Amino acid sequence: LYGANTTYHTGDDVYVIGHGGRAHALKAEVFARREFAGYWEYLLDEALFTAPLHPAWSGAALVDARGRLVGIGSLFVQQVVDGEATRGNMFVPVDVLEPVLDDLLTHGRRQGPPRPWLGVYLHDEEGRVVVQDVAPNGPAATAGLAPGDQIAAISDQPVVQVGHAWRVLWRQGAAGVEIPVTVVRD
């Protein structure tokens, strides 16, 4: 039923089955397996990226040639592949769903203590982690962070990429823990 993400490599053929079922299925190719760090405090260690783009990607099934589910459609992406702009999709590998599947089916969410949340939207900019925006009334807004601020460190640990910033943040304990953030403001 499920395929293991570790068995899929760049260049492998897969099928994207979105809204409309088999009639709208699309043969695609895995063009990358890599980290995906979302600006909205979201991180996948090994997302699957496919091309060409399937227009009904949200929640679409990514299936291998043996009919095994290997991913769930998450995002439309535009990236440079072999020097050319490529439109495609990003899929959450089923491997990351399996450990929390029972919780999702029973409770509608992952159980356990919630992670710390800053309420900040970040992006990578020339080797720096920069605030893109802050959530109204969130911890970052309360602390006075503003768009354009650089996050230089979290809990005295220097951060230079968004994905690393989320990892450092989430290692600090459960939601509600006080987290020192070093900010550089121009």
Predicted regions located by residue number:
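Active-site region of chymotrypsin-like
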Residues: 1-2, 26-87, 116-118, 128-132
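Short, well-ordered loop/turn sites that connect or cap secondary structure elements
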Residues: 2, 8-9, 63, 145, ...
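Generic structural signal for buried aliphatic residues
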Residues: 8-14, 62, 151-152, 179
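C-terminal cap/linker of serine protease catalytic domains
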Residues: 13-16, 20-26, 65, 69-125, ...
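PDZ/PDZ-like domain segments forming the peptide/carboxylate-binding groove
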Residues: 51-56, 60-61, 118-153, 157-161
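PDZ-domain C-terminal substructure recognizer with occasional recognition of PDZ-binding tails
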Residues: 102-109, 130, 141-146, 152-154, ...
